Amino acid sequence: MPAASDKPVVTRFAPSPTGYLHIGGGRTALFNWLYARGRKGTFLLRIEDTDRERSTPEATDAILRGLTWLGLDWDGEVVSQFARKDRHAEVAREMLARGAAYKCFSTQEEIEAFREAARAEGRSTLFRSPWRDADPTSHPDAPFVIRMKAPRSGETVIEDEVQGTVRFQNETLDDMVVLRSDGTPTYMLAVVVDDHDMGVTHVIRGDDHLNNAARQTMVYEAMGWEVPVWAHIPLIHGPDGKKLSKRHGALGVEEYQAMGYPAAGMRNYLARLGWSHGDDEFFTSEQAMDWFDLGGIGRSPARLDFKKLESVCGQHIAVMEDAELMREIAAYLAAARKPALTDLQAERLEKGLYALKDRAKTFPELLEKARFALESRPIAADDAAAKALDPVSRGILRELTPMLQAASWSKQDLEAILTAFASEKGMGFGKLAAPLRTALAGRTVTPSVYDMMLVIGRDETIARLEDAAAA
């Protein structure tokens, strides 16, 4: 049988639908997606919904939306772990038949009494079932669980692509339950059965699952199945080095969409969070697929850095195709529950992207810079801009308007007219630009007056100048 690493790569992302898609989960999904896509492999999605009390359809929908926004497409249908419970129970019974598991009739009260006595005597509280080697003829007619018969001596060794060689002393591991008394499988069994049946070759997940790998390896070996390649990645910490929590900022992937970060920038940043390719900070998803490997993942927790996130996102906005940028802005507005752009606003915004997209790190920032293109007359000036509209400035705007009406409305012609007008009036261009910015945008900081005029067009420009002159 070929080693897992020699077979076509199959990875999976297997979240529990008990809440939103956490940013850490988004990064785990991304690493699995990149590893599979870069090797022409398969990326699968499984929803681990065996906890019926906490799992909700709404949480599943939120996970799917988060993955879709990130652009992480999966192969085939989404697998429900709960729907496979009969298969899990079948494997538990097969382990029983193989002698790799046994029926345990100990009650919860008996187990707790054992642990209390062990604590009182200073012994290990690791439960050792008296039913492990019991003669089946002595089994009572009573409820039972099925426990795996784990080795009690030696060690289980995990060769991890990130953590290196990790050794677990078998004497420290108990005989875990694989099937409950009500016939439902435990998570630890279900994960292994699903990964085996789905053909998963590489298990890439958070290092909080590292201890599980030892027990899960025992299940693989008990069933004679090939053990996958393990890669346990460090968790994400806050900027202060502590475990990521709400006080550090947004935790859910969808929150980042609603805050206006571009998906490509988010993918780039999350890929770089704990993985590196030399000194490269900015890269496309295609480059990440080519470059990504498990050896580039560090063992230390990565720290979330919002300044770096914004820097990377700004670079992605600057190079995005206009049509793609418009689609993402529309999706951002919907996610943030903000009004959609009107046809006129969208037309003006797309026309002005050339002057806007290299100046913004997020979509809200871009839209703020595009206010001149999105607002309707009359344009309300803020306090700073209003100071530029004194009686002299209004007179200048009245004189300038007829000259602009005759312009061809090219950038060259507009530059020539405004430069000549400023020269004729004996003023620097900045002196002329200030009232123009107020009239066109109501702000003191704007794109160039030429760009604003070109974006909103002749009629709107003249109407705004006339409004300001008459104010």
From Swiss-Prot:
GO terms for biological process: glutamyl-tRNA aminoacylation. The keyword Nucleotide-binding applies. Gene3D superfamilies: 1.10.10.350, HUPs (3.40.50.620). Keywords: Aminoacyl-tRNA synthetase, ATP-binding, Cytoplasm, Ligase, Nucleotide-binding, Protein biosynthesis. Belongs to the class-I aminoacyl-tRNA synthetase family. Glutamate--tRNA ligase type 1 subfamily. The gene is gltX1. A motif ('KMSKS' region) lies at residues 243-247. ATP binds at residue 246. It comes from the Bacteria. It comes from Cereibacter sphaeroides (strain ATCC 17029 / ATH 2.4.9). The keyword ATP-binding applies. This is Glutamate--tRNA ligase 1.
